[in-house]
Curated annotation (Swiss-Prot):
<feature type="modified residue" description="N-acetylalanine">
    <location>
        <position position="2"/>
    </location>
</feature>
<protein>
    <recommendedName>
        <fullName>MLP-like protein 43</fullName>
    </recommendedName>
</protein>
<dbReference type="GO" id="GO:0006952">
    <property type="term" value="P:defense response"/>
</dbReference>
<keyword id="KW-0007">Acetylation</keyword>
<comment type="similarity">
    <text>Belongs to the MLP family.</text>
</comment>
<dbReference type="GO" id="GO:0009507">
    <property type="term" value="C:chloroplast"/>
</dbReference>
<dbReference type="Pfam" id="PF00407">
    <property type="entry name" value="Bet_v_1"/>
</dbReference>
<dbReference type="InterPro" id="IPR051761">
    <property type="entry name" value="MLP-like_ligand-binding"/>
</dbReference>
<dbReference type="InterPro" id="IPR000916">
    <property type="entry name" value="Bet_v_I/MLP"/>
</dbReference>
<dbReference type="InterPro" id="IPR023393">
    <property type="entry name" value="START-like_dom_sf"/>
</dbReference>
<dbReference type="GO" id="GO:0005739">
    <property type="term" value="C:mitochondrion"/>
</dbReference>
<dbReference type="GO" id="GO:0005829">
    <property type="term" value="C:cytosol"/>
</dbReference>
Amino acid sequence: MAEASSLVGKLETEVEIKASAKKFHHMFTERPHHVSKATPDKIHGCELHEGDWGKVGSIVIWKYVHDGKLTVGKNKIEAVDPEKNLITFKVLEGDLMNEYKSFAFTLQVTPKQGESGSIAHWHLEYEKISEEVAHPETLLQFCVEISKEIDEHLLAEE
């Protein structure tokens, strides 16, 4: 059991953004197909495979460039909480599953207290297939980078 637990991990980061928590959350729930417009070099597309945008149980296929290569991920929306501006995607299939038994992304966006802007909190939970697989720090950095680009895009829309 001790070996298995060393394969399980969590990474978290926070990104300060200028957009409202609601608008930023909305990009991932109602408009994920627009994310590629905000981050054209990183996210190449997002397609609804099954269900409805932003609804629990829906299946979304993301195409993105990570570590210099085009990557595909088929994700299921596991949780959505509009009050908390939270969404969780569980990876079902795709390139990440070559290195991880399980992988989930949670994004929660909270308004800053007493000032404009928000905090985008990314939480990655995963289980590696072996010790040789690196922890996904570069993927966490990818989340930071797309957050900044989406923020700029949302501000330009205003």
